[in-house]
Amino acid sequence: MITANEIRRRFLEFYKAHGHEAVRSSSLVPKDDPSLLFTNAGMVQFKKIFLGQEKRAYSRATTSQKCLRVGGKHNDLENVGRTARHHTFFEMLGNFSFGDYFKEDAIKFAWKFLTEELKLPKERLYATVFRDDDEAEQLWLKHSDIPAERIYRMGEKDNFWSMGDTGPCGPCSEILIDQGEHMTCGPDCGIGKCDCDRFLEIWNLVFMQYDQDATGKREPLPKPSIDTGMGLERITAVCQGVFSNFDTDIFQAIIQYTCGLANVSYRSDDETDTALRVIADHSRAIAFMITDGILPSNEGRGYVLRRLIRRAYRFGRLIGLTDTFLHKTALKVVDIMGDDYPELRENSDFMARVVREEEDRFNRTLDKGLSMLEDELATLSASGAAHVPGDIAFRLYDTFGFPLDIVNDIAEKRGFSVDEDGFKALMKEQKERAKAAWKGSGEKDIASRFQPLLEEGMRSEFIGYDHLCGEGRIVALMDEHALAVERLAAGQKGYLVTNRTPFYGASGGQSGDIGTIASPSGKVRVVDTIKPSPELVVHHVEAVEGDILLDQEVDLTVTEDDRVASARNHTCTHLLHAALRRVLGDHVKQAGSLVAPDRLRFDFTHIAPMTPEELAAVEREVNRVIMADIPLETDHMHYDDAVKRGAMALFGEKYGDEVRVVAIADESVELCGGTHLRATGQAGLFLIVSESGVAAGVRRIEALTGWNAMHAVLAQRSEQAQLSAMLKARPGEIVSRVESLQKENRTLRKDMERAAAQATSGQGRNIMDEATDVAGVKLLAAKVEVPNVKALRDLMDDVRSKLVSGIACLAAVDGDKVQLIIAVSKDLQTRFTAPQLIKDVAAEVGGSGGGRPDMAQAGGTNPAGIDAAFAKLRSLIGG
């Protein structure tokens, strides 16, 4: 039986033999496409090439791209595990032509690979073409053994592809395989008639031959291109003769491993099988997402990861996995796929720790959710309700990750039904809000703004590694809206491109240079420098003298102090990265950075806050290398050679075949295109000013170097002198003096709390006299004076200890706010619950609240409504 690994290998080798460059899979996080949450197709990393915004050294490529689809038109998460072919993570095999070959070779290659390499039976293969694509049909007849009756013409919905409303587009041709009559769904089964799995699409060939404008008009592209995609999981199922992707070797190793953990069998019952498939699928997604730098959080990509971890964990509970297990199944993914994706092995320890921590966190959350559901069911039972409202089910899902089926299961056992329609309506609202709120990854899509320049093939030669000034010619001039102009006059802002420039364009976390550009007729101040593509540098300018004209010869001068300050911070960023790995461990990976003239910021993967001792050790390490005054070496080499040398490739960065390596002896070797110092001693001083968390598993260090670090040290010295004077203590005595003051403060605070407790206890005895009888229920409703909410709760505890049977309501005013607490004795909870009562009572003071059946708390903003609130409570009890 051919394995998935063998299919992947054969595919890449086949296309390499036909002149294609085998390109590494890009990250699941699309670096240059802010419109996408995740990489969801093989063409994503080549999008700029198709759009004419980027050139590469090759014109044909092949990849096995890791992809993620978790919603929208591509995938409904709730279907994963329940169908044969829905997945979150998958691999897309693809071949691409960038103005090289077109339809004929694309069809020839595909047919040859399927029938000669994979040896699929020719008589079971079908093809579809776009309804107007006579050329594609003739090519299928010419280069394959598919007869005309097995070639179907389809409409635009099925067989026409576009990148968006405008841009490259074209017809496509799908290859399908007949899986046999036993898969027939009915008398109307057939291609274009149904969606069953008898005629299974295995490969899509996209022929990009048009450019569509905003009106929908399509013009032929000067260089048509090819984009194909074939899911590895699907073609593996076909080759292995199974009808579910989950029955392939890709998933079975994980499924059988999970069976061993849970002591269950696959193919025993639908519920168990679904759980095992979900765990296998999500384990793959989780392992790759964390490896690509995504960490659990409550928004964006991190929220998707958190949902997948929690969904898989819940399904584990359904098959008896009560302890944490998902970190183990994720490590199984590393065992299976680590040879083909080495980054999995490099990050396996950290990945497993992140999953384990998230499992532990969810375990605690689940217990809280179950408690909340029990409270809600008790309240509903007391009120005689038979249905769980949709908003309660949704709140449990949204807050605690409870799926509807778990709520249904628990509710059904207690005799309740669940308002599923209400739940689904709220889910729909949330999805629409999330869709509206998604503004992209936060990156500015600079390339699209300068699309015309890129399409013209405009390039800039960067000379700034060796020079801070130089001569060049203005080859493009634009106004502040990036529209082409002939001149910029004094006071006008705009953009300027020269054929040569010493200005560094913002990229790799480093800020763009500032400076001046002067011509014989005028001068502009460069306020920023941006880099829309690897070959193009654009100066954001403001004209300050005379006129600047298109096609003028100019002198370009970078502001030296800012460039050197940025170089200090960039070199120290490399030293910081290396020091963190030495002090904390090799799991540390860069998760983001900012290199500006005034500071550096470095985000990195690490579970826990750093201790003062660890921070001091990192600071010492960086300064040790600075004081050693080690020369920096830069070199250009092939990516594979750089990696063999030990150079670190940073998360989220895209690298070509030729890379620049920055080495600081044996201390640090990284792939980097930024500007650096000549030797580490030029950094002067490195000072960490803060360490904080920015997301689960991601820490941030902010630091200063050079003169900025020196100024900070002098400021700290001045502040220390002020503290010494205020505390009347010498510098070495400041800490002990503050400790003494804190001890004194704690003593005074305890004295105050003791006095407040004595006053509260006496108040509890006094207000018991205010209790009245309402419809046979003893009711105490009193307005009290307490210093804080804790004292109010303590007072209620005192009242409850004295109130054997009855209901108590205490109200306390704090400025323009009100706090209410209601308690219900156990014998009355079949008639009244505290959350049920406080909902209407709190409304009278402009508030709301909730709690347990025996006690609930609320806050309000209308102290004048307290009497009305007490009256409302009496009416509720009196019926």
UniProtKB/Swiss-Prot annotation:
Its cofactor is Zn(2+). Keywords: Aminoacyl-tRNA synthetase, ATP-binding, Cytoplasm, Ligase, Metal-binding, Nucleotide-binding, Protein biosynthesis, RNA-binding, tRNA-binding, Zinc. GO terms for biological process: alanyl-tRNA aminoacylation; negative regulation of DNA-templated transcription. PROSITE patterns: AA_TRNA_LIGASE_II_ALA. It is an enzyme of class 6 (ligase). Zn(2+) binds at residues 570, 574, 672, 676. InterPro entries: aa-tRNA-synth_II/BPL/LPL, Ala-tRNA-lgiase_IIc, Ala-tRNA-ligase_IIc_anticod-bd, Ala-tRNA-synth_IIc_core, Ala-tRNA-synth_IIc_N, Ala-tRNA_ligase, Ala_tRNA_ligase_euk/bac, DHHA1_dom. Belongs to the class-II aminoacyl-tRNA synthetase family. The keyword Nucleotide-binding applies. Binds 1 zinc ion per subunit. PANTHER family: ALANINE--TRNA LIGASE, CYTOPLASMIC, ALANYL-TRNA SYNTHETASE. It catalyses: tRNA(Ala) + L-alanine + ATP = L-alanyl-tRNA(Ala) + AMP + diphosphate. This is Alanine--tRNA ligase. Catalyzes the attachment of alanine to tRNA(Ala) in a two-step reaction: alanine is first activated by ATP to form Ala-AMP and then transferred to the acceptor end of tRNA(Ala). Also edits incorrectly charged Ser-tRNA(Ala) and Gly-tRNA(Ala) via its editing domain. The keyword Nucleotide-binding applies. NCBIfam families: alaS (TIGR00344). Consists of three domains; the N-terminal catalytic domain, the editing domain and the C-terminal C-Ala domain. The editing domain removes incorrectly charged amino acids, while the C-Ala domain, along with tRNA(Ala), serves as a bridge to cooperatively bring together the editing and aminoacylation centers thus stimulating deacylation of misacylated tRNAs. It is found in: Cytoplasm. GO terms for cellular component: cytosol. It comes from the Bacteria. Its EC number is 6.1.1.7. One of its GO terms (molecular function) is ATP binding.
